[in-house]
């Protein structure tokens, strides 16, 4: 059973990385909008799942916070995307669907740990892409990123705190 849990958590970790959010790549406004939308769709959905399924109150609280704040972020992003004439999809990307399916299989505190790990990794990637957007030459996206970075950092801190309470990452 322990091996199965480690394999599932490894799959979660692999599904959460965002290699395209590196700082050495020139800023792509459309790419930022699309990637942020995809992440927000998944975070809203996973947040609701965690709010309902979390074993610990901290997991349910983190899920509720992410569900609410990422929903607000996504609504603001959609408005911005419409002004920029960027069509945003309404469905999550395949790896986020796989992440959800993997999390659905996990019981109790194993779910809590997997969710916390996935959120730490996702929010690390979001922080990197939002920093890049905040430093970009696009004034609207820079303002959007600067406005939302504090919320993302708070969410990341809560997820990291929860992960630490649950024994930390199995990879550290």
Q: Can you annotate each of these PLM segments?
A:
Residues 1-14:
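Sec-dependent bacterial lipoprotein signal peptides
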Residues 16-172:
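His/Met- and acidic-residue-enriched segments that coordinate or traffic transition-metal cofactors
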């Amino acid at each position: 059973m322990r091996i199965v849990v480690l394999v599932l958590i490894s799959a979660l970790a692999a599904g959460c990385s965002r290699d395209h959010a590196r700082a050495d790549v020139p800023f792509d406004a459309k790419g930022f909008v699309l990637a942020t939308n995809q992440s927000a769709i998944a975070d809203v959905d996973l947040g609701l799942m965690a709010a309902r399924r979390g074993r610990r109150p901290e997991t349910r609280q983190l899920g509720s916070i992410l569900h609410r704040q990422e929903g607000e972020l996504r609504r603001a992003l959609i408005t911005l995307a419409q002004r920029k004439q960027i069509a945003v999809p309404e469905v999550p990307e395949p790896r986020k669907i796989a992440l959800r399916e993997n999390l659905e299989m996990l019981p109790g505190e194993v779910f809590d740990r997997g969710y916390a790990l996935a959120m730490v990794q996702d929010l690390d990637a979001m922080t990197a892409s939002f920093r890049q957007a905040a430093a970009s030459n696009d004034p609207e996206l820079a303002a959007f990123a600067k406005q939302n970075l504090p919320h993302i950092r708070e969410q990341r801190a809560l997820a990291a705190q929860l992960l630490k309470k649950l024994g930390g990452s199995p990879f550290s």
